[in-house]
A protein has these predicted regions:
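Surface-exposed, low-hydrophobicity beta-strand/loop segments enriched in small/polar/acidic residues
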Residues: 1-179
Length: 179
């Protein structure tokens, strides 16, 4: 029918149902496919990753108007919530490390899990970071470092909280065991 995941030719977003009264989802949070069949926020060690949240679309339960937002508030009562997810299994992402000290070029190629922190309620942006304490070569981890950010303000390995370029290792689209 077509390639799985979405690429630039389709705006790069897949639509996934979200259960009513679900947990809050912030812009660029890691989104996973739960065994319930609904998309939800991924935490450290979660498998079946779909991608990162670009926004949500739903019919507002109070106004009955179609609504797009870059986040989903917890306990949203809408019954038609769709998560709009950057879900290409070959998508590159940038993520800030939680390392308070210097990082090393030798971290490139290693895998890691994320450290989940709820996003900011002032701008609704994800608080997820790369958990530097999990950096190693374990194939069962969530993401793999493929390089340092190309942004000159975020690519100093001697500074705290460097930004890495990563790919998803535990993608639902590449997982052979199912949900």
């Amino acid at each position: 029918i077509r390639a799985y995941g979405n690429g630039y030719e389709s705006m790069g977003l897949g639509e996934y149902p979200v259960a009513a009264s679900s947990d809050a989802m912030f812009f660029q949070d890691l989104i996973v496919q739960a065994a319930t069949g609904f998309a939800t926020v991924g935490i450290a060690g979660t498998e079946n990753i779909l991608g990162s949240l670009n926004g949500v679309f739903f019919t507002d339960a109070n106004t009955s108007k179609p609504t797009f937002a870059n986040h989903l508030l917890a306990a949203n009562q809408a019954s038609d919530i769709k998560a709009l997810v950057n879900d290409s299994p070959i998508q590159q992402y940038e993520i800030r490390s939680n390392n308070a000290g210097a990082s090393a070029q030798t971290d490139v190629g290693n895998t890691a899990d994320i450290a989940y922190t709820a996003g900011s309620t002032s701008n609704f942006v994800s608080g997820c970071t790369l958990d530097d304490s999990t950096l190693n070569n374990n194939a069962a981890q969530q993401i793999q470092v493929i390089g340092i950010s190309r942004d000159p303000e975020n690519n100093d390995l001697t500074s705290a909280n460097v930004v890495w370029r990563v790919i998803i290792k535990q993608s639902l689209f590449n997982d052979l065991t199912g949900v």
